[in-house]
Amino acid sequence: MSDVLFPDLPGLEWDLSKKPIFNTKIMESVNGRELRASYQAVPKYEISLSFGFLRESKGKNELQQLESFFLERRGAFHSFLFKMPDDCDYTCSYSGDGSTTSFQLYKQMHTSVIPLAHTKAETVFEVDPTFWNENDNQQFWSDNDDDLFWDDTTAQVTKSGMVTLSKPLKQGHKFEVKGTYYYRCRFADDEQQYTNFMSKLWKANKVEMIGSLGNKV
């Protein structure tokens, strides 16, 4: 398992597909009633993509990048990180409780919330919490003379899907974090086909992966 990124190549076509998969054991009795057991809380994904062109001329070595990446992973053996187009950005909102400094980043999909295990690390940045407290009864000022009028809290996003604050936010104060997440993937098979359709031009009609937003696949 490594954190190397799948190559970002311009020949990637729009017909990328993903299929969420769960693991459910279903036992059926003679009268037709079923007993079901779920062995997987977070789905894995079957991901399929294709490259309409892979150039091998004028300083471009796109075929070599893709093929060598596959070889270095030993086919389906080693995993890697994949930034899926149009499915890689998160926006997370949190409320302070006066004590918590670490928060789990997540992907919001309509009513579903999926924890993220692989995110782009961000160095220290300033948190900009909402100015008004969600508690209407909270007084505007502080009785503590050492409290600043502005908030000087900073935050850092780790590569493991956590955001850490330099100090706890006050009860009810909210803040928002935006960034990039990755899928943990492996190749679906131990083989991959490339087609030479013109001089110095290749294509890969199908590159298939098994992926997850969790830490392992």
Language-model features: where?
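Surface-exposed coil/turn segments at beta-strand junctions on protein surfaces, enriched
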Residues: Q40-V42, G98, T158, P168-K170, ...
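Short, hydrophobic/aromatic-enriched beta-strand segments in well-ordered soluble domains
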Residues: F51, H173-Y181
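Secondary-structure transition/turn motif
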Residues: G52-F53, Y106-H110, L165-Q171, S212-L213
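Extended beta-strand solenoid/passenger and fiber regions
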Residues: Q64-T153, G179-V217
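A surface-exposed beta-strand-loop module
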Residues: W150-H173
